[in-house]
Every structure is written in C-alpha cells, then in structure tokens.
Curated annotation (Swiss-Prot):
SUPFAM superfamilies (UniProt xref): Formate/glycerate dehydrogenase catalytic domain-like, NAD(P)-binding Rossmann-fold domains
Pfam families assigned to the protein according to its UniProt record, in alphabetical order: 2-Hacid_dh, 2-Hacid_dh_C, DUF3410
GO MF annotations, alphabetized: 4-phosphoerythronate dehydrogenase activity; NAD binding; protein dimerization activity
Function: Catalyzes the oxidation of erythronate-4-phosphate to 3-hydroxy-2-oxo-4-phosphonooxybutanoate.
Catalytic residues in the record: 202, 233, 250 (proton donor)
Protein's UniProt name: Erythronate-4-phosphate dehydrogenase
Reaction equations catalysed: 4-phospho-D-erythronate + NAD(+) = (R)-3-hydroxy-2-oxo-4-phosphooxybutanoate + NADH + H(+)
The organism of origin for this protein: Teredinibacter turnerae (strain ATCC 39867 / T7901)
Length: 370
C-alpha cells in the first residue's frame, strides 16, 4: 500500500515502514495528485482534508497526528467511507509546559494568582491539574462539563476576576457554543486591569483584528497578551506580533514527546485498521517509544521557575518569530519545520535539594538520593 505522509511527522519509517511505501510531502503542499493513488494519508493541522483533496483518490484512511480536527471535513470523510483518526491529548503536556514557561518568564508564578481556563478538555484539563497541583487557584469555563467532572467550573463572568486567562478550546463555527471569534473587544475590556490573555489553542478563537486595534489603542497597560496561535497562519498579522508580550509560531505543542505521541497514536489506529493484531501493535509501540524517549536527564535547578525555563527557553522562540516577521509566510513555516528538540518535564529528574516536592504535579521526577 502507499502512505502519503507529511514530511514533518516524526518516526514515520520506524512506525509505518512495514505497513507500506512511505511518500513524504510538505504538509501545506499536499495535492489531489499526490494522493490519487494513495491508500492512506497522514497529516498535521496544516493540511486541509476535504472533498477537493480526496475525491477520486484511493484513500481509505486519514490520520492526523494532532489533537485538533478542524482541518478535516469529517462529514465528507464519513460519507465517503474513509476512516479517520486523530491523536487527542498527544501534545497536552507540551502545551502545559509552554503555558507555564510563559507565566514563569513574565513573573506570574512568583505571585499569588488566579488563573482562568477556557476549555478544559485534554489540554485545558491537563493545565488545570498542573496548576492546582502547584496550589494555584483556578476558574474553569467549559459548558460541556459538569461540576462533577470539574469542581472549579464557573460561569463566564467569573473569568473576569482572574489575573491570567488561558484559552484552550477547539475551533468551532456552529453548535450551541461556537468558538470562532469568541473573544473580541468586549471581552478584552472586561478583563481585570493588568491581566494576561494567553492563547495556545486555536488562533481564530480570538478576533485578531479586534485585538490589534485594542492594543494599538493604548490599552497595553490594561491587557498583556501571549500568542502562540494566530488567524491566517502562516500569513499572520505582522503588525500584531510587536504588540504582544510573547509571540511564537504555533509551537506550544511541539515538544518531542508531543510529536512522538501523535505518531504513535496514529500508528495504532492505522495498524488496527489494516488488521495488525494487538500484540504486534503493542510490541512495535513499546520498542519505538523506548528507543525514542531514552533515559531521564538530570536537571539542577533550585526553584520551580528556573526549572521550567530550563526546559523551555520561551524567549528563544519569541525572538525567532520576531526575527522572521519580514519573511512571512515562509518564515513562519520554516520556524515550525526547523524547531529545535524540546523535551517535556517528564524527561527531567531534578537533583537539587531546594526544589519543592510539588513539582511532581508537573511531571518532573525527583532524585531519590537528594
């Protein structure tokens, strides 16, 4: 069989090589001609998978190595009898690491703060657990959850009591709670004075034009902003980026583990679709995982902020995007393609006796001999 694979999907040979012939393509450039004779298509969020791409092709399986699925026309896939799979939660810990690195760099973790989280699914829920494990008070807004599922659920207006609001919703344009442009000028105005708005979910959830106008209107003292996701990627608004505190090229979930987990989850789905037995699938996943992840790395840090920023030097990513603002849209994609290896908290064993035990809530391990 032929498997067309986004060239940025890691471990493609190790995982999919025995299942068929691998044909690598740049994700944004995958065309109907590329997939005409393919049996399976493996993508990331940059590839629009719809009738225009797949009509007339032999594709019977589509896998996206991402949490989000708004780039897939799921209705078309179902009608066409094409199986599809995603990787929910694959990079949740990488996004949590990004959020905490932003808060650490901007000084919020050194203060007594109240954090609002919009959307408490895989990513938002992981962030909620990490923050509460650190003793941070959280306010969660998610109309699809109940109080039994999340004790910190609150109504929309409770968000405006928060010092920080983190956005982790999917992108939806219909249904009872559409998220497209959910946050615009009235929301910005209602936020607490000096608050931080952080979006590492989907760019279109925030009206970027309205945000730019608000920040250009001398409201930067009222509102600080961190953006990892943008409307119109990769052709983002180069005039908005200089107005925010941290600007990065959609790499929050680009941890090594996050990308690897996505590949592993889609391998499981494709192999099952092809009839590979569970024992063989599990053995392949275990072998690839052990080789890819390796042993824990010691990290000497005397406090939590230092530890977090040692694992994710977020100012590096911010500078990289600012340096490419005159090279958009190509520069945006180049940064994502060439993103350096970033390991999650779980890869590190903290060796300092000064570090608080609650860092294990983030996934760090502690040196038992300390």
């Amino acid at each position: 069989m032929k498997i067309v694979v986004d060239e940025n999907i890691p471990l493609a040979d190790a995982l999919f090589g025995d299942l068929g012939e691998i044909i690598r393509k740049p994700g944004r450039e995958i065309s109907s001609a590329d997939v005409a004779e393919a049996d399976a298509l493996l993508v990331r969020s940059v590839t629009r998978v719809n009738a225009d791409l797949l009509t007339g092709s032999k594709v019977k399986f589509v896998g996206t190595c991402t949490i989000g699925t708004d780039h897939l026309d799921k209705e078309f896939l179902a009608e066409a009898g094409i199986r599809f799979a995603s990787a929910p939660g694959c990079n949740a810990q990488g996004v949590v690491q990004y959020d905490l690195a932003a808060l650490a760099h901007l000084g919020y973790l050194a203060r007594d703060i109240r954090v609002g989280i919009i959307g408490c699914g895989n990513v938002g829920g992981s962030l909620h657990r990490a923050l509460t494990g650190m003793g941070v008070t959280c306010v969660c807004y998610d109309p699809f959850l109940t109080q039994d599922q999340n004790a910190d659920l609150a109504d929309w207006d409770a968000l405006f009591t928060c010092d920080v609001i983190c956005v982790h919703t999917p992108l939806t344009r219909s249904g009872p709670y559409p998220t497209h442009h959910m946050l615009s000028t009235p929301f910005f105005r209602a936020m607490r004075d000096g608050a931080l708005l952080l979006n590492a979910g989907r760019g279109e959830v925030i009206d970027n034009r309205a945000l730019k106008a608000y920040l250009q209107g001398d409201n930067s003292n009222h509102l600080s902003v961190v953006l990892d996701v943008w409307e119109g990627e990769p052709a983002i608004d180069a005039e908005l980026a200089p107005l925010v505190k941290i600007a990065t090229p959609h790499i929050a979930g680009y941890s090594f583990e996050g990308k690897t987990n996505g590949s592993l989850m889609i391998y499981e789905a494709l192999a099952e679709f092809l009839g590979v037995n569970a024992t063989e699938r599990s053995a392949r996943v275990a072998a690839v995982k052990a080789q890819a992840y390796g042993a824990a790395e010691p990290l000497d840090a005397d406090d939590l902020v230092t530890a977090i920023l040692a694992t994710h030097p977020i100012t590096r990513d911010d500078k990289a995007l600012r340096d490419q603002l005159d090279q958009l849209p190509a520069g945006f994609d180049a940064l994502r393609k060439g993103y350096p290896v970033r390991r999650e908290f779980s890869h590190y064993q903290l060796t300092s006796a000064q570090i608080p035990a609650n860092v294990t809530a983030l996934g760090f391990s502690l040196d038992s001999a300390k």
